[in-house]
UniProtKB/Swiss-Prot annotation:
CDD domains the UniProt entry points to: Ribosomal_L22 (cd00336)
NCBIfam families: rplV_bact
Protein name: Large ribosomal subunit protein uL22
GO MF, one annotated term: rRNA binding
Gene (UniProt): rplV
HAMAP family: Ribosomal_uL22_B
One of the GO biological process terms: translation
Entry's Gene Ontology cellular component terms: cytosolic large ribosomal subunit
Subunit structure: Part of the 50S ribosomal subunit.
Originating species: Paraburkholderia xenovorans (strain LB400)
Role of this protein: This protein binds specifically to 23S rRNA; its binding is stimulated by other ribosomal proteins, e.g. L4, L17, and L20. It is important during the early stages of 50S assembly. It makes multiple contacts with different domains of the 23S rRNA in the assembled 50S subunit and ribosome.
Keywords: Ribonucleoprotein, Ribosomal protein, RNA-binding, rRNA-binding
Similarity annotation: Belongs to the universal ribosomal protein uL22 family.
Length: 109
């Protein structure tokens, strides 16, 4: 039994989020939540919400026992970027890309 939760369009870059995802891949959910709780990174809070959602999906939809669950897969995909301009000297402008990503977490036995 595998249950997944997806967060689409998270407003943080995929590169920064993958650093957090690599730390919890394959861990039991209780240890993964512990790692995410004490991580100082912004991405840890976002990934933690997705992991909690996947746990709730497994418990509610499949009637799974939380103690037996582990993170079977977690992957981060790049999403659409927001294009913005910032003013520079002499009437010029520079383009800024605000990155976003899709977070997919799968939990199972």
């Amino acid at each position: 039994m595998e249950v997944k939760a997806i967060h689409r369009g998270a407003r943080i870059s995929a590169q920064k989020t993958r650093l957090v995802a690599d730390q919890i891949r394959g861990l039991p959910v209780d240890k993964a939540l512990n790692v995410l709780t004490f991580s100082p990174k912004k991405a840890a809070g976002i990934v933690k919400k997705v992991v909690l959602s996947a746990i709730a999906n497994a418990e509610h939809n499949e009637g799974a026992d939380i103690d037996e669950l582990k993170i079977t897969s977690i992957y981060i995909d790049k999403a659409a970027s927001l294009k913005r301009f910032t003013a520079r000297a002499k009437g010029r402008g520079n383009r800024i890309e605000k990155q976003s990503c899709h977070i997919t977490v799968t939990v199972g036995n």
